[in-house]
Amino acid sequence: MLLKFISLNLKLTAAATCVALSASTLPDLPEPVSNNAVASTSIRGKTYIVSFMGIGPGKQHSDIHNKVFMHTLGEFGWQNLPPVPSQQRVNGRIAASAVALNNNFFVFGGFSVNADGSEQTATDSYRLDPITRRYTRLNDIPVPVDDAVALTYQNRYIYLISGWSDHGNVNLVQQFDNFTQRWSQASPFPGKPVFGLAGAMAGNTMLLCDGVALNYYSDKKPSFESEPACYLGTVGDNANKIDWRLIAHPTGTARYRMAAINTQIDGKDMLVFIGGSTNPYNYNGIGYNGQPSEPDSKVWVFSVAEQRWLKALDTTPVMDLRSLIEIDGQIYSVGGMQSGQQVSPQLIHHPIKLQ
């Protein structure tokens, strides 16, 4: 009888531990990392969270790496996965994009930084199977990009929107068809080409906001400047055709390297934008204007049904994000930079509370 009681107690304790380690308490990353590509997916009852590449706390070019960490919800800690391959034989990338589709993770683009400070956009992209932990190389992006937005549609298509390509921004919407494994061009992004923008998609509706444009002048050198603008795109019967509309900006002040995600509030689709900085910056967190950048705490919520912005309470400030994840209906950022440009190992919970 005593043995049965002990056995039952152990089972109850284990069950309670698994619950505690679900969405309520996600473990920190094995090490601080920022500008990392993140995604999550659920397969046969197990949820996987992955962090691809990024930059470490030193924030120098030598701190950029190819490390991959994966956490299985309900388990302790993270596992080290094989590093992301590189056809260019670089030691790491930042500003890559990652999504989950058809029980796999996909990682696209990003850039490496050489010892002399020069940057190179990565041409190769990969699919990672979280079960076998094997990479499959995809066909190269027609125009390689970093600091772009990646969105999935109909569990088949992936859109790579705008971003930087070696020498300048592009206005392209490059579509990858996971059925045919081919790339094609969708209706181009209608605004100024930007990098470091954020976006999310619900159904056939996508929303892209902000980023940094390269502006040209007659009396001075070109300069990187924030671009406060939001564009709503609706995909038609043809997945390559997007009807774009300019919509009102929620504040009139752009944020750089924030992240966005689709979630539901009271059963309605909402596109939520979190984090970023109002002072665009280099990969070390120092602004292009020479001033240290600080993360923003504002939360923007766009109602897809009502086609308008809703007010929400602030959240924990964090910047240098590539994307967000949703676990058990709760939104988290993974890594990034917090106050003082400190690279973080934390998975920060961002409750969405409408005002």
What kind of region is each of these model predictions?
Residues 1-2, 18:
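Non-catalytic, low-structured ubiquitin/UBL-interacting segments
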Residues 21-355:
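Kelch-like beta-propeller repeat domains
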Residues 2-13:
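Bacterial N-terminal signal peptides that target proteins for export
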